[in-house]
Amino acid sequence: MNRLPSSASALACSAHALNLIEKQTLDHEEMKALNREVIEYFKEHVNPGFLEYRKSVTAGGDYGAVEWQAGGLNTLVDTQGQEFIDCLGGFGIFNVGHRNPVVVSAVQNQLAKQPLHSQELLDPLRAMLAKTLAALTPGKLKYSFFCNSGTESVEAALKLAKAYQSPRGKFTFIATSGAFHGKSLGALSATAKSTFRKPFMPLLPGFRHVPFGHIEAMRTALSECKKTGDDVAAVILEPIQGEGGVILPPPGYLTAVRKLCDEFGALMILDEVQTGMGRTGKMFACEHENVQPDILCLAKALGGGVMPIGATIATEEVFSVLFDNPFLHTTTFGGNPLACAAALATINVLLEQNLPAQAEQKGDMLLDGFRQLAREYPDLVQEARGKGMLMAIEFVDNEIGYNFASEMFRQRVLVAGTLNNAKTIRIEPPLTLTIEQCELVIKAARKALAAMRVSVEEA
């Protein structure tokens, strides 16, 4: 690979990139050149801030680690040929593993026929995916709107709730502290981290936040809103807060919130973008309490780690506000054939291989190991928690969490922090992780903590 001059034309740049895409292997000099090139382009054309962020998850502050390809269902290989067990899972997109052959085959077969829809003829895979989700999701959820990401699925849910509740004079939304629902304007209004919110103030009016897991605070907020005429259109929350640090609510919390929503005539929106698709040991985390939302948000793992897709699924009663004019909320690429093919294949793999049950089994194994390490290293680890294959290790301060991620990188295990909680390291591997790989992850974590304790003692 010849290095492009800084004055290279768009044609030359695209040809250079296509040449890279065609390559299956890199020699040593090509690898070094590619690493330098990627770092330069991130700095000059993407965002230099990403380079600083990457330093927290690479050994010795060397942020030249550049991914090259999947090494298997559960591993990644960088340009230097180093293979990493993936315990980050692209923030939860690789539930069925990297390049799952069933998902890849479905997308390739659809690509050979028609990659994107005409927008005028009826597209069969969108209809089939909507039917499949109606059969898969809990309760009376029946109609699906498709988009490209989690934040888009939340935006659609908020607009759907507004359209349904506006004639009833209900305009207020209640979200929870520590919540993360995305960064577009509506979703950001429900998100609860000031770092993400302050630069874009004022956000949408009518959003209130109450402590997550505190049912009396939820009741008080709903009651006060009713007294002041600010009746609540919907409550939006995550069954388990992912970016908040993998925060689990008390048992029965979702059930109690469902009852409050029914009592006050508010819709219940569950954001299962991160907890859905088998991640917590059930297909959807709300199924642990048999709770049925009015609107359900999905994305991330829905596309099988091959295609981006989001979905907003609602009951017929709620979704029917869009029947008269289906163009009130649409997106060009939402529900495209490639994405729907990936989602249908993903659902098939999850069910055929019973991956939610595997997530429960292997998640218990990993969590037991992490909790044992927490007992062995109380000076470093505050707590290990989680459900299924969504886990977190919380350290006593941010710096220790940073060092743990770096040490795990040296052990060839990929982990990272959460967006709303810097001292918490998230463990979110593919559900296809093998028992042997689970054992290797626990072993790597023990080595990492031992090395960190030595560093602390020497300091």
Curated annotation (Swiss-Prot):
GO terms assigned for molecular function: diamine transaminase activity; identical protein binding; putrescine--2-oxoglutarate transaminase activity; pyridoxal phosphate binding
Positions annotated to bind pyridoxal 5'-phosphate: G150, T151, Q274, T332
Cofactor names: pyridoxal 5'-phosphate
Example GO biological process: L-lysine catabolic process
HAMAP family given in the database record: Putres_aminotrans_3
Name assigned to this protein: Putrescine aminotransferase
Alphabetic keyword roster: Aminotransferase, Pyridoxal phosphate, Transferase
First-level EC class: transferase
Pfam families (UniProt xref): Aminotran_3 (PF00202)
PROSITE patterns for this protein: AA_TRANSFER_CLASS_3
Reaction(s) the record says it catalyses: an alkane-alpha,omega-diamine + 2-oxoglutarate = an omega-aminoaldehyde + L-glutamate; putrescine + 2-oxoglutarate = 1-pyrroline + L-glutamate + H2O; cadaverine + 2-oxoglutarate = 5-aminopentanal + L-glutamate
InterPro entries: Aminotrans_3 (IPR005814), Aminotrans_3_PPA_site (IPR049704), Class-III_PLP-dep_AT (IPR050103), Putrescine_aminotransferase (IPR017747), PyrdxlP-dep_Trfase (IPR015424), PyrdxlP-dep_Trfase_major (IPR015421), PyrdxlP-dep_Trfase_small (IPR015422)
Family according to the record: Belongs to the class-III pyridoxal-phosphate-dependent aminotransferase family. Putrescine aminotransferase subfamily.
